[in-house]
From Swiss-Prot:
Catalytic activity entry: [thioredoxin]-dithiol + NADP(+) = [thioredoxin]-disulfide + NADPH + H(+)
Organism: Vibrio cholerae serotype O1 (strain ATCC 39315 / El Tor Inaba N16961)
Cofactor: FAD
Enzyme class: oxidoreductase
Protein's recorded name: Thioredoxin reductase
Length: 318
């Protein structure tokens, strides 16, 4: 692997953050190189419909939106490389990265590798992803208006998803393997109010044993009692797995400051909101954001990262 590709700006990741960063960087004549990663288009490629993207009132599919973003980046001469980075060295300049196909060096780096939703690992769960199984209520909840859904999990994410869906679905079944929830008190209070006076039903000491369905999609779930091992079937049209996300930041461990796997960035008070603990390295999208995790917020931070990188490169005379 003697071939080394150098660029002023290298962007890792091909989701909304990466492609937006590419558009802004290319328009600034930084001649960015974007390395797609293994999941081209990011998490949105697993979303069937996107109906909250401003300007697209009719809605569009996740893959279609990402293809449009890719074309937009290419229009301004972003070089897109289909490769996966498996190691990095940020200890010297230029930064050095090693991919499956070749090595890369760059004067500035934007990390937009995203985060991956955690799943339970059931074969049936995998089989119905995008056809009734989701990990994002704000993305896909709309499609279950006035229908019964299940949420699996016991932390803040699960409770928030259940509360959100309770305003859309006819009935929300919250499934948790324990009898108490690992969530903030204010969320627990809201949850219990919805249980007592609303449309949320708790299934504690239960685990998801199987997702049930047919060629049309999910039709129900099979739950297992953690104390008796007895099983029961529940009729639902959607299943939301809410057991957290894993930021795709493993290759940067020990080199960048992180918190729970998410890359830490600056406050932005000095116009450097996306700068990491290493000058010249910036982060955007879900790899640094564990709160919002929306396509539009990822795109926004991608824009910010490109502007921050442009200022940095200018300050270095690059």
């Amino acid at each position: 692997m003697s071939n080394v590709k150098h660029s002023k700006l290298l962007i890792l990741g091909s989701g909304p953050a990466g492609y937006t960063a590419a558009v802004y960087a290319a328009r600034a004549n930084l001649k960015p190189v974007l390395v797609t990663g293994m999941q081209q288009g990011g998490q949105l490629t697993t979303t069937t419909e996107v109906e909250n993207w401003p300007g697209d009132a009719e809605g569009l599919t996740g893959p279609a939106l990402m293809e449009r973003m890719k074309e937009h980046a290419e229009r301004f001469d972003t070089e897109i490389v289909f490769d996966h980075i498996n190691s990095v060295d940020l200890s010297s300049r230029p930064f050095r990265l090693t991919g499956d196909s070749q090595e890369y060096t760059c004067d500035a780096l934007i990390i937009s590798t995203g985060a991956s939703a955690k799943y339970l690992g059931l074969e049936s769960e995998e089989a119905f992803k995008g056809r009734g199984v989701s990990a994002c209520a704000t993305c896909d909840g709309f499609f279950y208006r006035n229908q019964k859904v299940a949420v699996v999990g016991g932390g803040n994410t699960a409770v928030e998803e259940a509360l959100y869906l309770s305003n859309i679905a006819s009935e929300v079944h919250l499934v948790h393997r324990r009898d108490s929830f690992r969530s903030e008190k204010i969320l627990i209070d809201r949850l219990m109010d919805k249980v007592a006076n609303g449309n949320i039903v708790l299934h504690t000491h239960r685990t998801l044993d199987e997702v049930l369905g047919d060629e049309m999609g999910v039709t129900g779930v099979r739950l297992k009692d953690t104390q008796s091992d007895m099983t029961e079937n529940l009729d639902v049209m959607g299943v939301f797995i809410a057991i957290g996300h894993q930021p795709n930041s493993q290759i940067f461990e020990g080199q960048l400051e992180m918190k729970n796997g998410y890359i830490v960035v600056k406050s932005g008070l000095e116009g450097n909101a996306t700068q990491t603990s290493i000058e010249g390295v910036f982060a955007a999208g879900d790899v640094m954001d564990h709160n919002y995790r929306q396509a539009i917020t990822s795109a926004g931070t991608g824009c910010m990262a490109a502007l921050d990188a442009e200022r940095y490169l200018d300050s270095q005379g690059k």
